[in-house]
Design a protein with these regions (language model features):
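Activation segment/activation loop of eukaryotic-type protein kinase catalytic domains
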Residues: 335-396
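Conserved structural core of kinase catalytic domains
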Residues: 257-308, 376-378, 382, 387
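Conserved C-lobe activation region of Hanks-type protein kinase-like domains
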Residues: 399-471
Length: 517
């Protein structure tokens, strides 16, 4: 206990006192548990020990990183540790002090109450971690500089900075409002018959209720018949937290669809995330479906360039939201970007035509959360068998050696490939395309280039044609995504992966916001 008190003493008035008292009660509980003869005591002891270790690490970071820690944060910490103190005091009363040498059994009733307290402790740990995450990423007023870039105090730079700060504050509110134990997110099956049809170039299903004609979208997260219970429960935790994030998010600002909740279909070995259509939007199509449409190739580009830039910005913002919550997406591709047409206010043939593709791009949203996982969760490191998906993977993910587990910078590489496709308004999956499709195959044939050759081809496009198509700043963003933390950014590699990933995406967002057309 003394090590924690010494670590933060004098750094925050009021915080060390409540922390020391609270965690000393936790130590007292652990001493009393020694006298009990049940494996359950080991679980409770472990939770309390982890609680103390996490609190120690986080608090030392809070107050040693910046000596001017905001008073608001200090007040929040005092409130949080008062809650923790209440939990510990109730536990202390549940496990009376025994005489030396005595052994006591834990009754079923005591074990049941103990499990409830463990859930409360784990909830507290989760809430404390999220508050720490928000502080680490969003607690500083000054944003990090873009990699290989000097800050410019021009008009566009100031406006871009304000936009990024607005997004940062909005994400802060989302993370603060997310509760992984929220049970209301689970939708119960209803008896109304519905029809489900797959969206073209997508794993999503379009659902229509026969009576009300209400339409919504469903995304599946499946597990195998022989999955262990703990694997299924891990899926459940991820689905619940993703649903909560999407439920609380500002859909249009952040580029992710609002989620009504999820359904657990045990007979089908899957979870279903349910997404209603956003207001005044209709006719969803994946970006891949649009790019691969023969009509797109035949007629060419008819939408304004600024709309394509807005589409790119929305996708980057959506990825930032996911990374800020501590998740990796793992499938940043055009088939996981859903584009809605805007409904015409007064439908007529002319008005409707001008509000829809190809004259208008509509509104994009990032989808495809069926493989998303926490950034610190174990990675199966399975090879990708579909060549279309391989196009968007970084060389490290093809190599699959120790240390190549999927991380945030792999998402950022995939983002760079997607931004290339947006610039050319075509897809690398279109093998008939001389600009893109033929560049990823050897001699224009069916064999895909090696991962290293693909990266070189992408960089050549980013430095060659992209500046002419979208401007130099957009080209710089694409290059930054494809090169990741190379060169002068090597000094960031020793930092926490979550912090590096989110700071990097934040810098990319700022660079995109500086572009004016």
């Amino acid at each position: 206990m003394a090590d924690l008190a010494l670590g933060i003493a004098g750094l925050a008035v009021g915080v060390p006192g409540i922390v020391q008292v609270t965690l000393s009660i936790g130590d007292a509980i652990r001493r009393r548990l020694v006298h009990y003869e049940d494996d359950f005591k080991n679980l409770l002891d472990t939770v309390i020990r982890i609680n103390k270790s996490q609190s120690n690490d986080m608090l030392i970071y809070f107050f040693s990183e910046d000596q001017t820690t905001p008073q608001e944060l200090r007040d929040e910490l005092i409130e949080m540790f008062q809650v923790l103190r209440g939990i510990f005091e109730r536990l202390l009363l549940m496990f009376p002090e025994a005489k030396v040498g005595d052994k006591t059994k834990i009754t079923p009733a005591l074990k049941a109450r103990g499990k409830e307290m463990i859930e409360q402790l784990e909830e507290w740990n989760d809430r404390f971690f999220k508050r720490a995450l928000v502080f680490v990423m969003f607690g500083r007023k000054r944003l990090p500089k873009s990699v290989d870039e000097k800050q410019e105090d021009d008009e566009y730079g100031v406006i871009a900075l304000r936009k990024v700060e607005r997004l940062r504050d909005a994400i802060h509110k989302v993370l603060e409002g997310t509760n992984r134990s929220t049970q209301s997110l689970i939708n119960q099956p209803n008896a109304i018959d519905e029809t489900r049809t797959p969206l073209a170039h997508s794993s999503m299903q379009l659902c229509t209720r026969k009576i009300s004609q209400e339409t919504y979208l469903v995304e599946y997260r499946t597990y195998s018949d022989d999955a262990y219970e703990h694997e299924i429960l891990n899926h459940l935790d991820v689905v619940r937290e993703i649903a909560s994030i999407l439920r609380n998010a500002d859909a249009r600002l952040m580029g992710i669809l609002h989620c009504d909740g999820f359904l657990w279909e045990k007979r089908s070995n899957r979870f279903e995330l349910c997404f209603p259509f956003p207001a005044a939007l209709e006719k969803p199509r994946t970006l891949l479906d649009i790019l691969m449409d023969p009509e797109t190739r035949r007629t060419g580009v008819k939408h304004p360039l600024n709309q394509r830039l807005s589409l790119a910005k929305r996708i980057v913002r959506a990825l930032f939201v996911l990374h800020a919550a501590g998740f990796v997406h793992k499938q940043i591709r055009p088939d996981n970007v859903l584009v809605f047409d805007r409904a015409a206010p007064n439908p007529s043939s002319t008005e409707e035509e001008r509000t829809q593709y190809p004259y208008s791009l509509g509104e994009p949203f990032l989808i495809g959360f069926d493989s998303a996982r926490k950034v610190d969760a174990a990675s199966l490191m399975l090879p990708e068998k579909e060549w279309q998906k391989s196009l968007y993977l970084s060389p490290e993910r093809h190599r699959l050696q120790h240390g190549d587990e999927f991380q945030m910078h792999h998402d950022i590489f995939s983002l760079g490939v997607l931004l290339l496709e947006i610039a050319f308004w075509g897809s690398f999956q279109d093998r008939a395309s001389p600009q893109l499709g033929k560049r990823v195959s050897r001699d224009g044939g069916a064999n895909l280039r090696s991962p290293g050759e693909l990266k070189s081809a992408y960089l050549a496009l980013a430095k060659g044609a992209v500046p002419r198509l979208m401007g130099q700043k957009y080209a710089d963003v694409v290059t930054a995504c494809l090169t990741g933390l190379e060169g002068s950014a090597r000094d960031l590699e020793s930092e926490d992966g979550i912090v590096v990933g989110t700071r990097y995406v934040m810098a990319i967002i700022k660079k995109l916001e500086e572009i004016s057309i």
